[in-house]
Amino acid sequence: MTDRSTLDDAPAQADFIIAGATLIDGGGGPARQGDLAVRGGRIVALGDFAHAPGVPVIDARGLALAPGFIDSHTHDDGYLLAHPEMLPKVSQGITTVVTGNCGISLAPLSRRQIPQPLDLLGPPELFRFATFRDWLRALAETPAAVNVIPLVGHTTLRVAVMDDTGRAATDAERAAMRALLDEALQAGAFGVSTGTFYPPASAAPTDEIIDVCQPLRGRAGAIYATHLRDEADHIVPAMEEALLIGRELDCRVVFSHHKLAGERNHGRSRETLDMISRAAATQRVCLDCHPYPATSTMLRLDRARLASRTLITWSKGYPEATGRDFSEVMAELGLDDEAAIARLAPAGAIYFLMDQADVNRIFSHPLTTVGSDGLPFDPHPHPRQWGTFTNVLRTMVREQRLLSLETAIHKMTGLAAAQYGLTERGLLRQGYHADLVLFDPANVTDTATFSAPIQVSQGIHAVWVNGRQVWDGERTGAERPGQVLAPGDAIPWSQQSE
């Protein structure tokens, strides 16, 4: 860490200078031309200053420089260990990921038989951490290219403690989950996520969640992120439940991948966003989403029947279905939808469920951040894993002009940092950590599509994490400077002696 007393003699002692860039500071204000100097992983100067002889200078004329993007919703828990170069993320400008969403986290859980949807996080051998601290220690010992904001999953707690997740937890089981959660928070988790949409947690009543999550109460900046029980016909009572839980626990509610699923719910984002705005007047609340009108998760009958189109992303029961339309696979097998799902199971799918007008309206809300919600181990993933952030810059900024460039960057950086309680990140400020992305605003674009989803973005010229370059516009480097971040002003794991 660079001592603050050294800031005044920079940029003469800078490690490098990025010169002539359009500086978009992440706070939502107007862009300006200027230079930025980095030393010891920190921003030590920005604006108009003299360049000392011998300091490397990167010519950024015609390019934009912004804080590194924060992916507010990921399932990268296991991918960080298996693929620490994090190519799908750094190639689109992401420098920090929020893990443990939708109720599923890699830890605390050590077992070989992994039920859906936990298997979305990767193969069974990754589930080897009996405590949250064990997983964080592994990340600190073998760092990835990006920073990590860890959440602990309520579903993971249920699977770790209960012999039957198809019922409410007993008092003893609640106490055991509460103890695991307390350990996770003490180790460095920012909060809890739930996924009561999914069977391992759908039997959990509201009072169980409140009881288990009691360790959140009184923790400054604690997060309660939720994949709602219902994002379709019954979304309003599901949102009311989440807001109640947030009030009872006195913590921030994050509505994950906010959407209105199914044609009969298209247009209802006006109603749900109004609920969020009204709630924000009396409690801490925010939301995230991605720019696509399709979502992805395990293959389910209810989702397939709601969707206008279903695309199979993987299947253990019938691998030949991967990458194909579900309707085509049903015809090939001569089965109806219910029988075909049983034949393909376990499997994953992309569902075309949402209306683009709702997506745009949600994105425009002032409390919305950007979250890819990608499933990195899928053989044929949703393109959001590789292209969410550059898709926003192409479609919502440049083509549709739905958002100004400064507003889009604010949602990707400063707003997300504020909502998750990060200090000295998310903005271009002297003394802040040098998480940076240099890109061409006129040409930046996603190339990942639903038919060919594994493709790097174009127009991202360079990415730095904690002052070290992890992407040069064409390839990742050997650097793995990512840190496991800690809530508030706590010391990040990578700087702890233990």
From Swiss-Prot:
Keyword Metal-binding attached: no
Listed InterPro entries: Amidohydro_3, D-aminoacylase_insert_dom_sf, Metal-dep_hydrolase_composite, Metal_Hydrolase, Metallo-dep_Hydrolases_sf
GO molecular function: N-acyl-D-aspartate deacylase activity
First-tier enzyme category under EC: hydrolase
Gene3D superfamilies: D-aminoacylase. Domain 3, Metal-dependent hydrolases, Urease, subunit C, domain 1
EC number: 3.5.1.83
Annotated localization: Cytoplasm
Positions of region (Disordered): 478-498
Reactions listed under catalytic activity: an N-acyl-D-aspartate + H2O = D-aspartate + a carboxylate
Membrane spanning stretches: none
CDD domains cross-referenced by the UniProt entry: D-aminoacylase
GO cellular component: cytoplasm
Family, as annotated: Belongs to the metallo-dependent hydrolases superfamily. N-acyl-D-amino-acid deacylase family.
Name used for this protein in its record: N-acyl-D-aspartate deacylase
Source species: Alcaligenes xylosoxydans xylosoxydans (Achromobacter xylosoxidans)
Taxonomy of the source species: Bacteria, Pseudomonadati, Pseudomonadota, Betaproteobacteria, Burkholderiales
